[in-house]
Amino acid sequence: LGTEGKGFYACMEGFNVARVVVAAACLGGAEKCIEIAADYAKQRKAFGRPLSKFQGISFDLADLYTQLDLLKLQLARGAWMIDKYYSEPGSFTQKQINPIIAQCKWLAPQLAVESAKRAIMICGAFGYTKDSPLEMAMRGAMSYVAGAEGAANIMKIIISRDIFGNEFVDK
């Protein structure tokens, strides 16, 4: 199973892979919420115009879309680093990988929640009914914010250690 006394470290390595999966799931959920809201905004009319023509709607989705794109890039970077870590030993250390993955795990669930929330607002009353996939998206995203594979504050500790060093960050 591994070297005696090193089980904790082996377990912690596994968290990075799991956090990539969690972040990817959240980004997929966020993307779907943005798509649903955009489709609805193109079809639904107010004052004779599609909702998408109102900047309050289009700018919200532009913000979410931009954050989604940036997080996809960061997640791809982190996944690539993990792949290299296992396929080319010595290419990266866990110390180099940890903060990248923590950033993704911290921000992706928040983006998924925010995307679901804004999509629900754009879709109005339909958005939070059981007939809408958005209410389920919100519940699913919240489970990742609350703690699956490490709560947001744990991710911030990992990132803080990268900034300040272990000796300057409380555990």
For each of these PLM feature ranges, what is it?
Residues 2-6, 10-171:
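Alpha-helical interface subdomain recognition
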